[in-house]
């Protein structure tokens, strides 16, 4: 105990975060039926993922084996709705504008319904004119999150569960990693999605924050 209270681990947030913009986002989204939102983002994986916790006899350290060579990153582009995970695309390496446009035009846009709102962060590839036009041709809209606000998108929590499942799978080849990602995506349920929506401030009608 310190004179000013307990000594706790700090929760760090980006100093560039603009609270006025975040408040405006809350005002904009609060009247919207959460079922209209389609959250789209990317996450990276590799062939050296391993569980971060393990059991060991009392007084001994838990140890595990993991490859030091992670290989090239595998990127997953995916969407989350109240029904769970939507269209997904696996890429070798990172995401550039052409890759993201290919995902949107080939997978995401055909799945959209008129009136849906695709929510994206501010990655440069997300702002490509071809992305917005493909979304709007389906009668949907593209909205962009406030900068430095991963806490406002429930797909971040979906990716957290996905990574936990991949750590448990322990894939050590690219093919094994791809094979592990598919069932991990299916393991994300509508109940998961609704919980994450509510946690991020988008509760379904009738559910209080």
Please identify what each model-predicted range represents.
Residues 1-209:
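Short functional hotspots at interaction and active-site rims
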